[in-house]
Amino acid sequence: MDHTDNELQGTNSSGSLGGLDVRRRIPIKLISKQANKAKPAPRTQRTINRMPAKAPPGDEGFDYNEEERYDCKGGELFGNQRRFPGHLFWDFQINILGEKDDTPVHFCDKCGLPIKIYGRMIPCKHVFCYDCAILHEKKGDKMCPGCSDPVQRIEQCTRGSLFMCSIVQGCKRTYLSQRDLQAHINHRHMRAGKPVTRASLENVHPPIAPPPTEIPERFIMPPDKHHMSHIPPKQHIMMPPPPLQHVPHEHYNQPHEDIRAPPAELSMAPPPPRSVSQETFRISTRKHSNLITVPIQDDSNSGAREPPPPAPAPAHHHPEYQGQPVVSHPHHIMPPQQHYAPPPPPPPPISHPMPHPPQAAGTPHLVYSQAPPPPMTSAPPPITPPPGHIIAQMPPYMNHPPPGPPPPQHGGPPVTAPPPHHYNPNSLPQFTEDQGTLSPPFTQPGGMSPGIWPAPRGPPPPPRLQGPPSQTPLPGPHHPDQTRYRPYYQ
């Protein structure tokens, strides 16, 4: 800019500034001469230069200034605009009308363009733009371009009507609702993590499941007496843990079981199975009572009295007591609960003689036996208590006459208490019909009560031995039973 201004000033004024102008122009002329060496008339150039300096200085200045303008002034003014022309336009404020659209835009995997109308492949549920889908179909390819699955038809869907799975790259399945998409994610993609939990659950459930299966088997098996004999071992296996709690009580049960089943297994396992398998036994006794015993009361009584413990023994006793197979099951169930069942022979008199108070020694026992049958309904509780609790069990059996019967159970004198007799007559009709044999086990515990209560607490076998003698005074009907039971108890 300075050079051009000075040059223009020098040309305009031929005064003192002329020398300066000449000096400044000399290099320019030299440069011009060097550039135009081939030209024949250098003077003419001077005249040309001089003339333009005065009249058309724009020629010389234009040539030189053109370059200078582009390099200096012109470059700054026009160059900036050319280099950043957008700045001028974006200086204006722009008001954007409308709202942001939350609807996602998907791009076609075939053409890479945003999809406005979807072509949805059925049944693979992949989407492409409708044009690509139609073209692909026209080519005769009935396979999805994405997954190579056969395509039955192509659905036309608008933007915003589909929900695409993006949980796993490459899935890209589309669904018509968010609910369907979530179900797909849970079923296809979240299932990978679930198998572990399911496996763990399965591991947890298997142990639980087997017992239920055993229980149903027990329920199914009880009807068959022979099966019942097999059932006790399962119950024993299942019940071993509970025996610890019922160890004393179990000992009493063990003698009965020993007689009824293998002593080794019964001594250890039988007590626990009773506690756990009481329910199963109850069911089995119910079935037996229904099948074998005619009276319905047996079902109700047996249901309550059926406490599982006797069930295993009934199977074993059944073969032994073929004469009284039906009654033996319910009664056996009852005595095992009391754990003084070994003296079953007295029960027969109980069923009939129960009403008879003449039996001096056995009457109190009969009373207890009569009262116990109702408790038999609550047989399971008695089983849980230890041997000493057998009396406590009797109170549960005495649930109908709870106050009176328990004391008699503890001691002979209480046994003779008349109130129990009152309860006995009430329960006698039911027991006589339902449990002719059931009453005997109760009578046995009653008869054994004076001598058995202490002995059974210690060793279960001695009470059994004591039981038969106490039974001996019982009427004749009991004796045949005693003969049957005695071999087992002895």
Curated annotation (Swiss-Prot):
Compositionally biased intervals (Polar residues): 426-441
Protein name: E3 ubiquitin-protein ligase Hakai
Known role: E3 ubiquitin-protein ligase that mediates ubiquitination of several tyrosine-phosphorylated Src substrates, including CDH1, CTTN and DOK1. Targets CDH1 for endocytosis and degradation. Associated component of the WMM complex, a complex that mediates N6-methyladenosine (m6A) methylation of RNAs, a modification that plays a role in the efficiency of mRNA splicing and RNA processing. Its function in the WMM complex is unknown.
Pathway annotation from the record: Protein modification; protein ubiquitination
Chain positions covered by the region annotation Disordered: 34-60, 254-490
Region (HYB domain): 147-205
Zinc finger region(s), RING-type: 108-148
PROSITE patterns: ZF_RING_1, ZF_RING_2
Source organism of the structure: Macaca fascicularis (Crab-eating macaque)
GO molecular function term, any single one: zinc ion binding
Gene Ontology biological-process entries: mRNA processing; negative regulation of cell adhesion; positive regulation of cell migration; positive regulation of endocytosis; protein ubiquitination
Listed CDD domains: RING-HC_HAKAI-like (cd16508)
